[in-house]
Amino acid sequence: TEGDRDISYPKNLIAFAEAQKDNQEIAFDKERDKMIIVFDADIFEEKVQDYDKLVASGEKDNILAVTNPAFELFLLLHFENSYEQDILPNEEAIIKNGKEGNQTFIYQLLLGKTGINSKKNSKIGDLAANVDTAISQEKKLNQDIHDCKGKITCNIGSIIESIRNDDGK
């Protein structure tokens, strides 16, 4: 949220989600509801240890939505044939996700498709109209967040699909 900045580190996101469960303004039902915590796994490729421990603790009372290397991957999946045209031919570069200036490789791929800054321009939300394309294409990727090191990974579409298919029982 606007008032909660600099908490993008996965461990901090999980702690933030846990704290929000006690926020009376959101009426979180601890018996029925779960927080969905979205984070990038690229930080665990080289810099940060204990990914497995973090996932195990985070999954206890939450749903973890993970992208490797970054959320821009999920956004890229909203474009028809982006898996075949953009992701598959660039697999190695996507996983390395090196920076050119301040921009990562996956960010640049998405920028090439959208022409907009996905981190600052709210028009990126228009991609939601193509979420079914993203869900379909995501199935061609690794969706197992327990085995994502060195693999292009995304499970956000599968979470959306499971929410859509939830009959509430």
What are these regions (language model features)?
Residues 22-36, 41-169:
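C-terminal accessory helical subdomains adjacent to catalytic cores in phosphodiester-
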Residues 1-32:
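Acidic, glycine-rich catalytic loops of TOPRIM or P-loop NTPase phosphate-binding modules used
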